[in-house]
Amino acid sequence: MAHKKGQGSTQNNRDSAGRRLGVKKFGSEFVRAGNIIVRQRGTKIHPGNNVGMGKDHTLYALIDGVVKFEHKDRSRKKVSVISGNFGE
């Protein structure tokens, strides 16, 4: 017979910290080359013009410019960076 009564509940009481995923720079925001635009798991949003993708699917700006989100087709979104003089 067990000499301890069911006291195992604290072993299951852990959780992992949030991963801080999501959009970091929104549409029409100015970005510098190298700025992270989206952190994501998988290609929820695809890279468009002047946007690079890291090995963890992070999207980042390749040039200075303004962020533009658009639809690639019905189910896919993409993000691009539009260059130009914007006074920043």
Swiss-Prot record:
Gene Ontology molecular function, alphabetical: structural constituent of ribosome
Keyword flag Ribonucleoprotein: yes
Residues in the signal sequence: none
GO CC list: cytosolic large ribosomal subunit
Pfam entry (one): Ribosomal_L27
GO biological process, one term: translation
Segments traversing the membrane: none
Keywords, comma-separated and alphabetical: Ribonucleoprotein, Ribosomal protein
Residue ranges of the region described as Disordered: 1-21
Matches recorded under InterPro entries: Ribosomal_bL27, Ribosomal_bL27_CS
Intrachain disulfide bonds: none
Keyword Acetylation attached: no
HAMAP family associated with the record: Ribosomal_bL27
UniProt family annotation: Belongs to the bacterial ribosomal protein bL27 family.
Protein name: Large ribosomal subunit protein bL27
